[in-house]
Amino acid sequence: MKRLGAHVSIAGGIENAPLNARAIGATAFALFTKNQRQWKSPPLLPASIEAFRQNCADGGFEMRHILPHDSYLINLGNPDPLKLERSRAAFIDEMQRAESLGLELLNFHPGSHLNLSTPDECLRRIADSINMALEHSSCVTAVIENTAGQGTNLGNRFEQLAALIEMTDDKSRVGVCLDTCHLFAAGYDLATADAAGETFREFDRVVGMRYLRGMHLNDALHPVGSRLDRHACVGKGKIGLDAFRLVMQSPAFEEIPLILETPDSDGWAEEIRMLYGLQ
């Protein structure tokens, strides 16, 4: 089964996330487990944790279909030792928060070298950060999101994702989330069914489909290779519907969270219905 959803709000309490997902007809969802604009947040209350788990169960959401995202403040490749330490501590906290909720995944952007080190040195720092976080948690999988390649962000090439996985000690607890807008912006063509098929075959060759743990289904405002991370509603950008039809019809994308991060949250329910209609 295809598991579609969106990145929903936790306003009023994290236990509201599954309710918000259910309201749009989702069968998966993404969320932040804290205020993503702050380095530190108070611990989750036991009552909120219990209510979150109960609402997930009541809504039919399995934990493997929920894709929490870490704070955008975190840079696991930061060349500054003090800032790197702060990012690592925050990432470990994110892993432990996810674990306390019973979640199985944590989605994150790999990191940036800020023109202060080589890309290879930055990849090593990111991999070391992943290994540290896995040592400080017991069951959550670190899910690396591909990037558009803006600025000095790494993770825009499949080879970089493969390198991070190779340097991760416990490969059973590392995976990838493919964002379609980021793929397109990074130069991987998705504008036709043939092009999209070749892009996913290349991912399989370089990284391996066995590591795919989720996707962000976003169209792109800018042309292929722009390196600009600007999302559009599905079918209303430069990608078009062919790639999304392929995802919805291919068995390779079964039973992983397929998450909308498109700009019109009021239209998510309709986008979900439209995507299911592509099957």
Swiss-Prot record:
One annotated GO molecular function: DNA binding
Annotated residues for binding of Zn(2+) 2: 145, 179, 216, 261
Protein residues bound to Zn(2+) 1: 69, 109, 145
Enzyme class, UniProt record, top EC level: hydrolase
Catalyses which reaction(s): Endonucleolytic cleavage to 5'-phosphooligonucleotide end-products
Cofactor, free-text remark: Binds 3 Zn(2+) ions.
Paired cysteines (S-S): none
SUPFAM superfamilies assigned: Xylose isomerase-like (SSF51658)
Sorted UniProt keywords: DNA damage, DNA repair, Endonuclease, Hydrolase, Metal-binding, Nuclease, Zinc
Ligand binding (Zn(2+) 3): 182, 229, 231
The family this protein is said to belong to: Belongs to the AP endonuclease 2 family.
Protein name, entry field: Probable endonuclease 4
Annotated organism of origin: Chlorobium luteolum (strain DSM 273 / BCRC 81028 / 2530) (Pelodictyon luteolum)
Source species taxonomy: Bacteria, Pseudomonadati, Chlorobiota, Chlorobiia, Chlorobiales
